[in-house]
Amino acid sequence: MMFLFENSINMIKYSIYLVPLIIMILLSISIKEDSNRMMLLFKSLKLTIILILVLLTIEEAIYVKLNGHLIKTELITFVEYILLVVSYLIISMFEEGVKEGRKTKITEEALILMYSSLIGMLISMEAHNLITLFLSLEITSICFYILALNKNSRKVSIEGGLKYYIIGGIASTIILLGIVSIYKNTGSLMYTDILVIGMERIGNYQVQMGIALIVLGLIIKLGVAPFHGWLIDTYEGTGMLMTFYLTITQKIVTIIVLINLYKNLITYLNIEVINKGLLVLILVTLIVGTVGSLRQQKVIRFIAYSAIVNSALLILFFVGNNTEELIIYSIYYLINYIIGLAVLINIIIGVVKTKNGGNIEILSELKNIWLNNKVIGISLIIVLIYLAGLPPFTNFISKIILILPLIVEGKIYITMIIFFLTVGIMIYYMNVVKIIIIDKKQEVGVETYKMTKGGSITNIVGGIIWIIISQIYLDEIISIIKIIVAIN
């Protein structure tokens, strides 16, 4: 009886992946009126995400499916919740923008592609077979390439999308080359088989090289320096909300895939070259992200460079010895980053806008927010200080607990360099705060702002509440995360 119940749950789960996709395609070609079609697509996509969340709650937290091709743990389940909630939030923001007539750059095809990419991401996080991982990553990547363009005819968008496609293709080729190298030497693509054979042939450099190539390909997809050039141009051409979607979802999935590889293969095979190589990339990324952000005037490029810096901090668990604890802190840091960035983008595109209906694009335009609404101005300052990681906010503490284990392990010089570089990004965040508070004189040619109403206010209030609560219950939140992902 229990076996039949589990099979029924599996059938429902995988049909929920595919049936809504078919329904959305049929809706997009059968309904003639544009507004009705878009609203139905939004509702069906949000309902599908809710159903998947319900199924995640019903099914077992740990399972092995499809002959070991998919394995789910408490950590993966927890991160899947985060991914689905973030996706629901972004889709709701797109829906609100369409209702209010804002320029959100969303089409019916884009909604279908967003859902298709979500399917690929959910599978890739559970993948325990290299070819399953590769195919699911490619589903996501193909959707992202098209979303980066999203029917935008601007030169910068086309150029960014083309760069994304080329670099993504190179990264996929590197990953596939690593998979081929591993299969040639082990005769298997399953993580467990690779681990057993790899430990028997501990001196076989080809298996280690194959895993290193897979990690390198994933790092390129993440946008870590010096493989970051495509990311800046791509994000600038996609629009603020789509940038938010691409930035957050890509980080969530890539980090979890790297954690899976680390916990299942890299740790046991003792591949030191990966740890040392990633340490160099982390330092280079922090330097590039910090220096690059200091000379940016556009909001979206500033967010892109900030994303590069945060990518480096999120993969610090690779260079530490206490991996389990560092993974917990990385997840906690990721949650703080998502909430802070969500509130920032909600303020910029959802609460205030120019007279002609456009979004704030230049950082210097932020000075007028203080003149028009001091409550929103204060909220924006709080979020910027929170993202900068200044004390006493929890984002400062989450950075500290990520970096401090390196001191315990004796990596003092590396820790000092990381601290110095993170201070650099704090300086630029504080420069933006200065623009809001001090440079508040209205200038000719700068539009005033009109307040809008809707879900954006709710999102901002919710984010500010999290910032306050996380200050008070920091230890409790980290303990809850440890319990959820079954790490003590």
Swiss-Prot record:
UniProt cross-references to InterPro entries, sorted A to Z: ND/Mrp_TM (IPR001750)
Q: Where are the transmembrane segments?
A: 11-31, 38-58, 74-94, 106-126, 129-149, 162-182, 211-231, 239-259, 271-291, 299-319, 331-351, 376-396, 412-434, 460-480
A Gene Ontology term for the protein's cellular component: mitochondrial inner membrane
Q: How does it sit in the membrane?
A: Multi-pass membrane protein
Q: Which reaction does it catalyse?
A: a ubiquinone + NADH + 5 H(+)(in) = a ubiquinol + NAD(+) + 4 H(+)(out)
- The EC number(s) this enzyme carries: 7.1.1.2
- Where is the protein localized? Mitochondrion inner membrane
Top-level taxon of the source organism: Eukaryota
Electron transport found in the keyword field:
yes
Statement: the UniProt record of this protein carries the keyword Transport: yes
Q: Which UniProt keywords apply?
A: Electron transport, Membrane, Mitochondrion, Mitochondrion inner membrane, NAD, Respiratory chain, Translocase, Transmembrane, Transmembrane helix, Transport, Ubiquinone
Q: Which GO terms describe its molecular function?
A: NADH dehydrogenase (ubiquinone) activity
Q: What role is this protein assigned?
A: Core subunit of the mitochondrial membrane respiratory chain NADH dehydrogenase (Complex I) that is believed to belong to the minimal assembly required for catalysis. Complex I functions in the transfer of electrons from NADH to the respiratory chain. The immediate electron acceptor for the enzyme is believed to be ubiquinone.
Which family does the entry's similarity section mention? Belongs to the complex I subunit 2 family.
What is the official name of this protein in its record?
Answer: NADH-ubiquinone oxidoreductase chain 2
Protein's gene: nad2
